[in-house]
Amino acid sequence: MKKFLTFLAVAFSAVSLYAGEFPDISINELKQAISEKKVTVIDVNGSDSYKEGHIPGAIDFAAAKANLAQQLPADKGALVVAYCGGPTCGAYAAAAKAAHELGYTNVKHLSAGISGWKDSGQTTEKAN
């Protein structure tokens, strides 16, 4: 039992550290950053989902990950936001980590994901 409790404590600590590494951004904050053209948004839901509907201006991570550095702004302090399906999806971390490893220091995630974005009445755009 003691080993199990130790395992849980370590696991929760790791999750807390990980969540702190890429802070959450609210839908309203992201919407404002988009309207002010102060954010690069990365969709991590896969190309098929991206084609069906994504946050306006978002990059398709599946298609762009090989040349992500060229897709991101020159300013390493610029806001970069990654998102996936919703609150239980952790796929966003691949893009967030990739941006972080490229030297970006203001990387956040939209934990609400595309489902929360749509549920809040925000618009999406489709890709050809």
Where in this protein do the model-derived segments appear?
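Repetitive helical segments and hydrophobic/amphipathic motifs
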Residues: A11-F12
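Structural scaffold elements adjacent to functional motifs in cytosolic proteins
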Residues: V41-D43
